[in-house]
């Protein structure tokens, strides 16, 4: 995927409360190709927003971060795959049986609907978590990069197609996982934007150089007075 155009690498999150707000943002970003639908919008609208995106021929990152027992994971991924989404998140810490069940469910659901199966992405360590929180609150003694590497390797061994990780962990994943393993990176902020509430951030250009396949860029675009101009500005940062 190294030949992807800049605009195809940028995923814009629809972090809005309802369909009307989602449509407004989508239509203000005609050049954006990939949109993320997270928990807030999906719980509020169900599949309606997915249908709207498909009608506009946009790609969909369904970011539900599923985490449950294997049978439930299989069923949820089977149902999600029927919508024809491109990326779907599951928690890497759900364990190997759940990861394998999720992959099987996604393949079965897509086949039943006659669509391509989504690439499942294992969520490793949330970018809002610091090393101190991981150690003190979650009692995980591993350093963040080592823990991410372990979770990503395990996910790929279970047939999962990619992972979500912060930019700083991209370097260790270059050797830990195959070249085909998709790396989706939030915690990306252009040089002209503030870091916000994410602890481990990097510029778009730095993240791509470190091995990211896709970048999730939210508030620098969506909160801008002119989202289309901000989107173009991020694209220009990625264009040599």
From Swiss-Prot:
UniProt GO molecular function: orotidine-5'-phosphate decarboxylase activity
Pathway(s) served: Pyrimidine metabolism; UMP biosynthesis via de novo pathway; UMP from orotate: step 2/2
Active site per database record: 65 (proton donor)
Keyword Membrane: no
Leading EC class: lyase
Recorded superkingdom: Bacteria
Keyword vocabulary terms for this entry: Decarboxylase, Lyase, Pyrimidine biosynthesis
Keyword Lyase attached: yes
SUPFAM superfamilies linked: Ribulose-phoshate binding barrel (SSF51366)
GO aspect biological process, one term: 'de novo' UMP biosynthetic process
Chain sites annotated for binding substrate: 15, 36, 63-72, 127, 189, 198, 218-219
Reactions it catalyzes: orotidine 5'-phosphate + H(+) = UMP + CO2
CDD domains per the UniProt record, alphabetical: OMP_decarboxylase_like (cd04725)
GO cellular component, one term: cytosol
This enzyme's EC code(s): 4.1.1.23
Subunit description: Homodimer.
Family matches, as PANTHER family: OROTIDINE 5'-PHOSPHATE DECARBOXYLASE
NCBIfam families to which the protein is assigned, alphabetical: PRK00230.1, pyrF
Known function: Catalyzes the decarboxylation of orotidine 5'-monophosphate (OMP) to uridine 5'-monophosphate (UMP).
Record family assignment: Belongs to the OMP decarboxylase family. Type 1 subfamily.
Protein's recorded name: Orotidine 5'-phosphate decarboxylase
Lineage, opening ranks: Bacteria, Bacillati, Cyanobacteriota, Cyanophyceae, Synechococcales
């Amino acid at each position: 995927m190294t030949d992807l155009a800049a605009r195809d690498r940028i995923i814009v999150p629809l972090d809005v409360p309802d369909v009307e707000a989602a449509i407004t943002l989508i239509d203000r970003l005609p050049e954006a190709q990939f949109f993320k639908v997270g928990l807030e919008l999906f719980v509020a609208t169900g599949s309606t927003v997915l249908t709207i995106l498909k009608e506009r021929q946009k790609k969909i990152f369904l970011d539900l971060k599923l985490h449950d027992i294997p049978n439930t994971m299989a069923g949820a991924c089977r149902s999600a795959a029927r919508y024809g989404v491109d990326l779907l998140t599951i928690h890497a810490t759900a364990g190997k049986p759940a990861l394998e069940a999720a992959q099987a469910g996604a393949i079965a659901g897509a086949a039943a609907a006659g669509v391509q199966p989504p690439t499942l992405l294992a969520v490793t360590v949330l970018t809002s978590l610091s090393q101190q929180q991981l150690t003190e609150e979650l009692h995980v003694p591993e350093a963040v990069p080592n823990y991410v590497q372990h979770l990503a390797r395990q996910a790929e061994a279970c047939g999962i197609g990619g992972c979500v990780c912060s930019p700083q962990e991209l370097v260790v994943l270059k050797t830990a996982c195959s070249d085909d393993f998709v790396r989706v990176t939030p915690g990306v902020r252009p040089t002209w934007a503030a870091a916000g509430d994410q602890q481990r951030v990097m510029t778009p250009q730095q993240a791509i150089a470190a091995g990211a396949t896709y970048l999730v860029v939210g508030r620098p675009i969506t909160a801008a007075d002119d989202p289309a101009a901000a989107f173009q500005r991020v694209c220009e940062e990625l264009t040599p």
